[in-house]
Amino acid sequence: MNVTKPATQRPKLPSVGRLGLVDALAGARLAELGWTEHDDQAHVDLLWSLSRAPDADAALKVLVRLAENPDTGWDELNAALLNERSLRGRLFAVLGSSLSLGDHLVANPQSWKLLRGKVALPSHAALLESFVDLAEEVAAAPASAVHRLRALHRDHVLVLAGLDLAATVEDEPVLPFTVVAAHLADIADAALAAALRLAEKTVCRDRTPPRLAVIAMGKCGARELNYVSDVDVIFVAERADPISIRVAGEMMRVASSTFFEVDAGLRPEGRSGELVRTVESHIAYYQRWAKTWEFQALLKARAAVGDAELGQSYLAALMPMVWTACERDDFVAEVQAMRRRVEQLVPADIRGRELKLGTGGLRDVEFVAQLLQLVHGRSDESLHVASTVDALSALGEGGYIGREDAANMIASYEFLRLLEHRLQLQRLKRTHLLPEFDDEEAVRWLARAAHIRPDGRHDAAGMLREELKHQNVRVSRLHAKLFYQPLLESIAPAGLEIAGRGMTSEAAERQLAALGYEGPQTALKHMAALVNHSGRRARVQSVLLPRLLDWLSYAPDPDGGLLAYRRLSEALATQSWYLSTLRDKPTVGRRLMHVLGTSAFVPDLLMRAPEVIQNYGDGRTGPKLLETEPAAVARALIASAGRYSDPLRAIAAARTLRRRELARIGSADLLGLLEVTEVCRALTSVWVAVLQSALEAMIRANTPEGGRPLARIAVIGMGRLGGSELSYGSDADVMYVCEPASGVTDAQAVKWSTAVAEQVRAKLGTPSVDPPLEVDANLRPEGRNGPLVRTLASYEAYYAQWAQAWEIQALLRAHAVAGDAELGQRFLLLVDHTRYPPDGVSAEAVHEIRRIKARVESERLPRGADPNTHTKLGRGGLADIEWTVQLLQLQNAHEIEALHNTSTLESLDAIAEAKLVAEDEVKLLRQAWLTATRARNALVLVRGKPTDQLPGPGRQLNAVAVAAGWHNDDGGEFLDNYLRVTRRAKAVVRKVFGS
């Protein structure tokens, strides 16, 4: 009797789709292997095992290639796969994770047997023996040496990968990361030993080989190696003779062509130095010439192969120097430079995918561990360990970082290293780059290879994305916390939640000094003041400070920044929004720390205009600091001052809005959000608004109630005010013109207008905590000796008869900025005949300008000033460029209307367009003007007061470089660029002036 199976009963063998196989040929490949012919439990288990491989299709393709190779012994392998779960786990995991190891198995088809049975990792000694024995064997047959040694190396990597990956497919033990990394270093040691033996045979033949020790550095030295990595080495010989050098060179050649790249770039003097040195030569170098990074590199040094006694002598001689490196004068500067160099190595477009150098990546963890080892290791031998994991553990045990934080950092580090291993295994290529996050197939493969499984809310790829985000954020937070939390614990009161073991005050001071603080004792006092009071503020500060202090340590002046933060926090103690904003908006905190740690000018403004801090965040269209238009600020300032009949209150209102706008401009400038031309225009706009407000207030004050002003007054901006090119420290150069009201004589109008103008100058110039508001009218006819205010007719008569060359030159930048606009325009039309005469200015006037310029260069530079670095009057500085432009205007403006312009930069454009000066030379002038203006603005931002002289090398110059928008905080590099740019511009200036 035939029994028909119910239609709903599913076959025991899973379908290709259920197995997750997506290759169109997958079904045919399974059939070719004979795995779909039987539906017994063994075949079902086999197929489900295959489906769990990170890339089951890739694994299946290699299995078919193995089946087709007669040397594989397919029947034996097939039977073993059906019956041995551990073999399935290792083999399928390897074939689904590593295309290169799959190719190795196809080329060496008997190597699958290495994954069979009770597989254990060989010891370091066993590895050395197997590699060296093979080297001895192949030395007589060099033609096969590379192939056989490489196959042995790959076999050992295969076994390790099989054990490392097996848990992704079957319920096999998980190998700890530390075991994997240490075994990879053991394999590397054995490979180096084999290469050394072959090199000795090749170079020395029957002679006794030289005593040569190979010191492993980097990850190999620390026994935390990657699957694919350069192996960094240093060679130490008893005698640095030609034989030793040849052996070392041959060893590198053999190892690099057979196993992995061997790099001796960490040796003294790097690639320019001798390949081999004696112990004594190494000692001499490290005592006299070595940089901080070279001592940092020695943290990982280990005698790997070669002469063991010589290797130990090297370590015994040099390691004590490592633990005193933090006492070197340049230690802090070099550490800060190393931090920045790492950050700048990664292009912005791939930073989020960089496992090693990206934010919250492996280098962040390694840098923390190594810096803290260097700082505290001189007084604590428990920190004398090589690997990152061991270092973090020791730092936790010693109280230098919290134990829980150390455990979390280790967990994040091991997770990121696991991903790095999986990425490298795929093609046995050196890489640290995660796949594009929208590459679903690649992300899914990596997740499965890393044994990440779906959780019900996310598939494996989604889980990996979430885990990466979590780990990067955790590392970034811990990066700050590990440096500063123990410091806070050492100063916090017992009642505060953060109080723990902390570290000694001496250790805390050492650590702060290493992080860039020149006054670590004072810094600790500031930190204590911030957390040593009761209530919510202290608790919030204790949470905020690790991150804020970390950001501050990247600023040019962390000492000044911490003081400014303390002052600001104390001033805003009653403002609940302040700490809440810093807590909830990291962007605000990061930007604020940069500003406080760079500038003395802006923090003083923020103390009295703290609301600007709320605009340090981002809005929907970008930074909130840029949402304010200077023109809108000017209108608001004039309107606010206009509400008061009392001139003092009106000017006070204008000062308040000016203060807020200066804080906004300075902040945006320091944060790199504004171009220098935008800064100059914004500063000019707010100055003009203040002038307008003050003028209106004084006119109201001098006009009887119900009466009318005796005159109309216009304020003419001169110099940089007229050109809309003011800097932070600029005075307002002005002239006043008046026109009598109906029925008022010229004399009455001038007297009344003079009183108004004097009051404007006096009230604005009243000493204040704000940046000064100096009004300078010395560019008026006859200078200080001439009347402060004139009528149009008086100006016309004077300029027609008495105008001197310098007065004509000054008029080139005259522009109506405040007061009666119509009167101002009539004044400009009047002086056009003087500054742009139809036939051009006289040759005598041009000659006089040249003479005055020469006198200015020799007499006006302040005593003691460096002419090369004085931004205003120095070589190729602002005065040089502006005088050059003005000379060309005087000579050519009567023919070229585009030169009727008060802006230096716009006039340079016109000069280039008219080909008065070669275009490349105009570019030099423009670059010098922009460079000097940035530097001059930066000087005020950094020092908090007007100054024109660049400082010498040191912290202040570094801060000026940062404030000027230089791409790093290397003040020397910034200064070199300034000198180069201004020197080239000076050559053009001399050419134009004919000198």
From Swiss-Prot:
Its EC number is 2.7.7.89, 2.7.7.42. Gene3D superfamilies: Beta Polymerase, domain 2 (3.30.460.10), Nucleotidyltransferases domain 2 (1.20.120.330). Residues 1-487 are annotated as: Adenylyl removase. It comes from the Bacteria. Pfam families: GlnD_UR_UTase, GlnE. GO terms for molecular function: [glutamate-ammonia-ligase] adenylyltransferase activity; [glutamine synthetase]-adenylyl-L-tyrosine phosphorylase activity; ATP binding; magnesium ion binding. InterPro entries: GlnE (IPR023057), GlnE_rpt_dom (IPR005190), NT_sf (IPR043519), PII_UdlTrfase/GS_AdlTrfase (IPR013546). It catalyses: [glutamine synthetase]-O(4)-(5'-adenylyl)-L-tyrosine + phosphate = [glutamine synthetase]-L-tyrosine + ADP; [glutamine synthetase]-L-tyrosine + ATP = [glutamine synthetase]-O(4)-(5'-adenylyl)-L-tyrosine + diphosphate. One of its GO terms (cellular component) is cytosol. The keyword Ligase does not apply. Belongs to the GlnE family. HAMAP family: GlnE (MF_00802). This is Bifunctional glutamine synthetase adenylyltransferase/adenylyl-removing enzyme. It comes from Mycobacterium marinum (strain ATCC BAA-535 / M). The gene is glnE.
